């Protein structure tokens, strides 16, 4: 009996009672919680506190929930914490130290301050004080077991990363509270969210890495921030009429996103906004979009895309590695196609290049294996290295002379290319520009050509070269090199009348079988019985049928002749 009485007295002394494994403590004077918890701090699993709490008390609570003042894990087991009848007051010691930024955090009245339970990985359920008005930055970040939190009606603000890396499964924004940056970042169990109708912006990282499968965006939404939904489980997206901006990587790697409806009125889509959305099959970008960055790269299921009519530039990496893309429109006003814009679009058949196009970037159409036609307008002035490298489907190609320099690897590994005409105006063909065009048999070079670089036409099957330059272009013994010779064996070289002697003295060129062309530089005698095999316009473009003006006809015996159709 005496022992029982003594135990009752001791429990009264610490003002705590145990009911169904919950310990209840009243802290009349802030900063005295440790006196009442005593040696039980590592055994209590469920705790309710009434009274006043300051920074000193939260040092203990953090210790009980698994992390000490030096951010070292403890033996604490506190899983359930009810502070609904407690009050946070200013004062006491710093409850948390950010050693990276050398910053200490102290309590303020009615605030759950920055990092107040940061990394308390034992905490599973928490009820906040009824008077709480603010939840601070990273307040519960990395509370990796926290699945239930009760917020008071008077709460006015939740700040950035407050619940990041917790186990919260659902959340409704009420009482005017707005989403904050990184608020639920990497909350892998979060599946349901209700956003406030008055919300105008979803900040960066708000829902990245969550398990949300569907969400209704607010009718007043204006902006979706950087990585706002990246790596989440969304299956569809319907943008409200008010939306103006989708920021960088907003839906990056949403691997279940199969349907996207973009609104008229949308103005900008930033880089990688929908990259790696590998279930997305179609996309139509509204004409209201005026700012566009490379936002659909690695969408491997994407089959068709519609670009806005007012677009003047296709950005770098726009559809890079969209391996199933079959069709895309290039708007009439486009002047620039960026680097890697359509790289590795292995099913892209044909692209219509608009008049007015001026430049094509590096690797823009590299490894577009199924492209069959490359018809560039005379307005194109520059193309980047590797622009059409590996476009295996092209058989006949004519390039405009407006491209004064054909750069390195621009058309290399076009293994089925048989006939190539380079237009008047081109001066330089850089190294390896057409290397490994293994089926190339007929080549026409312009009178303006001055130099041919290292291995520019190496490893081909050339049987005929028609070079219209009076002065032999500079080249070296690799420019036309084959597997076992400097030039293709038994290859005919047609040169302008009067230029044969110069070519016979020129290194490399003298290895060809040299013949002078007719006066036109195009016509030659046609053998009896020879038939037409191909027809070209004066600009070098292949013709499907006779056209008015000068036609260049390729004959079955390897000769060419010029006719004028009136």
List PLM regions with ranges.
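Consensus positions within tandem repeat domains that build extended binding/scaffold surfaces
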Residues: 113-116, 136-141, 159-162, 181-183, ...
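Residue-level detector of functionally pivotal "anchor" positions at catalytic/ligand-binding pockets or at interdomain
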Residues: 516-539
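Terminal processing/anchoring signals of secreted or surface-associated proteins
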Residues: 47, 503, 520-524, 540, ...
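C-terminal tail/sorting-segment detector
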Residues: 1-3, 552-566
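Short, T/G/N/S-enriched strand-turn elements that build extracellular solenoid repeat scaffolds
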Residues: 31-40, 56-66, 70, 171, ...
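Bacterial Sec-dependent N-terminal signal peptides
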Residues: 1-22
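Structural signature of tandem-repeat unit edges
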Residues: 22-28, 45-53, 74-110, 121-134, ...
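Short, surface-exposed loop/turn motifs with a glycine/proline- and acidic-biased composition
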Residues: 537-559
């Amino acid at each position: 009996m005496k022992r029982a009485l003594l135990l009752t007295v001791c429990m009264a002394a610490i003002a705590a009672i145990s009911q169904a494994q919950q310990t209840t403590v009243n802290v009349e004077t802030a900063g005295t919680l440790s006196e009442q918890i005593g040696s039980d701090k590592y055994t209590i699993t469920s705790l309710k506190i009434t009274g006043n709490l300051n920074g000193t008390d939260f040092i203990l609570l953090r210790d009980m929930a698994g992390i000490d003042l030096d951010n070292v894990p403890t033996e604490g087991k506190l899983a359930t914490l009810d502070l609904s009848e407690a009050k946070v007051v200013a004062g006491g010691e710093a409850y948390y130290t950010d050693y990276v930024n050398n910053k200490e955090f102290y309590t303020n009245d009615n605030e759950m301050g920055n990092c107040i339970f940061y990394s308390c990985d034992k905490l599973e359920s928490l009820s906040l004080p009824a008077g709480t008005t603010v939840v601070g930055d990273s307040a519960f970040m990395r509370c990796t077991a926290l699945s239930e939190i009760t917020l008071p009606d008077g709460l006015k603000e939740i700040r950035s990363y407050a619940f990041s890396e917790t186990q919260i499964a659902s959340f409704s924004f009420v009482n005017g509270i707005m989403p904050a940056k990184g608020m639920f970042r990497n909350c892998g169990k979060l599946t349901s969210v209700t956003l406030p109708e008055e919300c105008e912006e979803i900040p960066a990282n708000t829902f990245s890495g969550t398990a949300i499968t569907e969400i209704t965006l607010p009718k007043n939404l204006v902006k979706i921030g950087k990585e706002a939904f990246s790596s989440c489980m969304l299956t569809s997206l319907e943008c409200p009429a008010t939306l103006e901006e989708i920021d960088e990587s907003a839906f990056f790697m949403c691997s279940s996103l199969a349907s996207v409806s973009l609104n008229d009125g949308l103005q900008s889509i930033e880089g990688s906004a929908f990259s790696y959305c590998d279930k997305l099959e179609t996309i139509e970008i509204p004409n209201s979009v005026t700012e566009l960055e490379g936002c659909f790269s690695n969408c491997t299921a994407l089959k068709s895309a519609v670009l806005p009519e007012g677009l003047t530039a296709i950005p770098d990496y726009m559809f890079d590695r969209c391996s199933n893309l079959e069709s895309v429109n290039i708007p009439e006003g486009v002047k620039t196609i960026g680097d890697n814009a359509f790289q590795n679009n292995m099913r892209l058949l044909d692209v219509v290049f608009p008049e007015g196009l001026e430049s094509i970037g590096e690797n823009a159409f590299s490894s577009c294996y199924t492209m069959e036609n490359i018809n560039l307008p005379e307005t194109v002035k520059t193309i980047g290295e590797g622009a059409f490298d590996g476009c295996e489907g092209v058989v006949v190609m004519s390039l405009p002379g407006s491209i004064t320099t054909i750069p390195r690897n621009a058309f290399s590994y076009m293994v089925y290319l048989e006939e190539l005409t380079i237009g008047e105006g081109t001066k330089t063909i850089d190294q390896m520009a057409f290397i490994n065009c293994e089926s190339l048999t007929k080549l026409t070079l312009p009178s303006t050509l001055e130099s041919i670089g290292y291995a520019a036409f190496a490893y081909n099957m050339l049987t005929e070269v028609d070079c219209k330059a009076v002065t032999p272009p500079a080249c070296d013994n690799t420019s036309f090199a084959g597997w076992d010779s400097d030039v293709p064996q038994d290859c005919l070289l047609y040169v302008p009348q009067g230029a044969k002697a110069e070519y016979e003295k020129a290194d490399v060129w003298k290895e060809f079988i040299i013949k002078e062309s007719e006066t036109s530089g195009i016509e030659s005698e046609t053998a009896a019985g020879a038939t037409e095999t191909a027809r070209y316009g004066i600009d070098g473009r292949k013709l499907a049928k006779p056209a008015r003006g000068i036609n260049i006809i390729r004959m079955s015996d390897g000769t060419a002749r010029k006719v004028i159709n009136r």
